[in-house]
């Protein structure tokens, strides 16, 4: 099926959902050669991935993912595509901790660095939070703290077959989109950042087809796969089965506009220090972008009625010490599970 799919793509034809699912299944099952995988990913990128294709690919990955042992209503994921080349600090990871401090249940799906110096797994480890919990321990951590980390290589072991070709291609591929679309815990609510605003309506449509109830798919005008404080943020909001697109500016939420360089991070330890400083009350660009994205999560999870009130609440959580206490709680619970195993 992969050979057939590749032939169709080279003819400029779009794949059906079924063909896409079967083709990705062959890759996930180790039935494709590295050359076939590389050609498939590169030609697909050149053609442009369509909604039905992405749905099929995501279904193939979800079918092969390790099972997460519990289902919780209102579960949120904050996971971006990466690949934006911005080298910012780990904004969505920091924002997830803020939202968890207000009682939002978050199953953060992520990995180590691919295109940056520090992935979500790297910075959490630098903050003292173990990331390689078993599914049972991760579920227990979620129950106890409202936050757990789902380490992608553990849950998506079939992805190893595509790892080599992806690394050698060294370009964005459909797998950048698929990571955020395949949360092992089946999160029903999602803040998903993408690297190109043109992807927003299609990705929102895919999330709807994958039974996500509410989503904010976002892209910064500066290329960030986050809500940004350097300029305009583009949003596709999925709610009640409908998709609404709109734009926001940082000034709408009482936030200053900053230069992109002020958001730049470094390695995991440098990014951990930035996050620790934000949680300790430091003012500036890092705080403002965390407030904006955490406020969006609180709105997404129906903790507040608007992103604006979410930003205000996020500031209260940080300044009241609740976010730092949440980080310490997660560190204690997850660390205890590692030592006990």
From Swiss-Prot:
Q: In which pathway does it act?
A: Amino-acid biosynthesis; L-tryptophan biosynthesis; L-tryptophan from chorismate: step 2/5
What EC numbers are recorded for this enzyme?
2.4.2.18
Question: A Gene Ontology biological process annotation?
Answer: L-tryptophan biosynthetic process
Q: Which cofactor does it need?
A: Mg(2+)
What residues bind Mg(2+) 2, as annotated?
A: 225-226
Query: In which residues is 5-phospho-alpha-D-ribose 1-diphosphate bound?
Result: 80, 83-84, 88, 90-93, 108-116, 120
Q: What note does UniProt attach to the cofactor annotation? A: Binds 2 magnesium ions per monomer.
Q: Which UniProt keywords apply?
A: Amino-acid biosynthesis, Aromatic amino acid biosynthesis, Glycosyltransferase, Magnesium, Metal-binding, Transferase, Tryptophan biosynthesis
Q: Where does anthranilate 2 bind?
A: 166
Pfam families (alphabetical): Glycos_trans_3N (PF02885), Glycos_transf_3 (PF00591)
Give the residues annotated as coiled coil.
Answer: none
Catalytic activities: N-(5-phospho-beta-D-ribosyl)anthranilate + diphosphate = 5-phospho-alpha-D-ribose 1-diphosphate + anthranilate
What's an example of a GO molecular-function annotation for this chain? Answer: anthranilate phosphoribosyltransferase activity
Q: What class of enzyme is it?
A: transferase
SUPFAM superfamilies documented for this protein: Nucleoside phosphorylase/phosphoribosyltransferase catalytic domain, Nucleoside phosphorylase/phosphoribosyltransferase N-terminal domain
The family annotation for this protein states:
Belongs to the anthranilate phosphoribosyltransferase family.
What does it do?
A: Catalyzes the transfer of the phosphoribosyl group of 5-phosphorylribose-1-pyrophosphate (PRPP) to anthranilate to yield N-(5'-phosphoribosyl)-anthranilate (PRA).
**Assembly state and interactors?**
Homodimer.
Protein's recorded name = Anthranilate phosphoribosyltransferase
- Species lineage, top-down? Bacteria, Bacillati, Bacillota, Bacilli, Bacillales
